[in-house]
Amino acid sequence: VKPAIVVFGLCVSAAPAWAVCADDKVTVAGDWGQASFSVDVADDNAERAQGLMFVDNMPTLTGMLFVYDRPQSVSFWMKNTLIPLDMLFVAPDGEVLRVHENAIPGDLTPIPGGDGIQMVLEINGGLSRRLGITEGDVLQHPSFGAEAILPCGEKTDG
């Protein structure tokens, strides 16, 4: 247990830091600090349809980033999803517009993200609350364009 706590402590920080901007990394920053997640990117219809279906275990600071070509209304469900998930619905500038916590595995009830969503970050259920992630926090990733609140190469203010 102690090694996991040490690793977690190194990955989540309240101090400003240079975020690593890579396709397989997402940094989430807010008043609580910041956390970097290793992610798989789902940026086409087939990958988005598959999502995290049939995944039975996911390391703590890992997730999936769903990327859309343009802002739109999105809705998710948990069909064939085996683990609880938190969903962060994100605007084109990287601002978290909605957080849905602890989506129920296998539940077919639609989970609406709202309008103007460009990306969705799925992480382990309950992790948003444990870290303090809320609406208004900001994501940093290379997929955000010139309108990004926190462009790649910029310091995150945790």
Report the location of each language-model feature.
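Bacterial N-terminal signal peptides that target proteins for export
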Residues: 1-6
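N-terminal signal peptide c-region/cleavage motif recognized by signal peptidases
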Residues: 13-17
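Compact, glycine-rich, soluble single-domain proteins
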Residues: 20-158
